[in-house]
Amino acid sequence: MSGFFITATDTEVGKTVVAGALAGVFRELGYNIGVYKPLQSGHVASNPEGDAARLKALSGVPTKEDEICPYSIEEPLAPRLAMKRAGRTVTLKDIIHHYNERLKEFNSLFVEGAGGLAVPYTEDALVIDFAKELQLPLIVVARPTLGTVNHTVLTIAYAKAHGLTVAGVILSGCKECEMERVQENKVMIEELSGVPVLGLLPFFEGEFTKKEVLESAKEYIMISKLEECIRNESTVAHTSSN
């Protein structure tokens, strides 16, 4: 299997935009990439304002929203609590089953978690437990400004302590007026974590188009580095299957 697990230092940091944009760029490059966000709270999957619909729109996948996100609920709470309050039970086994179903359509998947790695996810797992099952390299999406060094370094350390590989960090929501501080934060994150910051994605104000987001991803994210990871994963998977 190949792809990336997109996580973050917090909620509302920009995971969905990053995941959808990267998938869209890779699909334009000819890769058979799909997107998967097993659990979503705050919107049902079909809601155009929700993450599943935005993933579909940005990535350009033919997959239906309720297949991108098989478990969704309106209440904006941690997924485990939201499902419990709605009287629904979702287990780690359930979301892995749907992951394997998506792999029947695509060679690689970009998987988006919920919030950060320690978020209560299914009834029996945190987000990090799901990431450990998939063993995909992580992309950590983080805020660009004050507090991000601490949050990002802690997230990376937590991931590494659980045996996960962190491919890189993307700082999302960068404003031109803050770029001096953003660059300083980038350097500190790399020095303290040993993980590269692969992109400084701009802040998108108001309504934005798929074209704007994908063009920004191509300009501000090191797509070639991520492409190298995908190729290496595919080579390892092919070698292991022989």
UniProtKB/Swiss-Prot annotation:
Query: What are the disulphide bonds in this sequence?
Result: none
Top-level lineage group = Bacteria
Q: What is the lineage of its organism?
A: Bacteria, Bacillati, Bacillota, Bacilli, Bacillales
- Role: Catalyzes a mechanistically unusual reaction, the ATP-dependent insertion of CO2 between the N7 and N8 nitrogen atoms of 7,8-diaminopelargonic acid (DAPA, also called 7,8-diammoniononanoate) to form a ureido ring.
Q: Which gene encodes it?
A: bioD
A single Gene Ontology MF term assigned here is:
magnesium ion binding
Q: Which cofactor does it need?
A: Mg(2+)
* Binding sites annotated in the UniProt record for ATP: E12, V13, G14, K15, T16, V17, D51, E112, G113, A114, G115
The protein in question is named: ATP-dependent dethiobiotin synthetase BioD
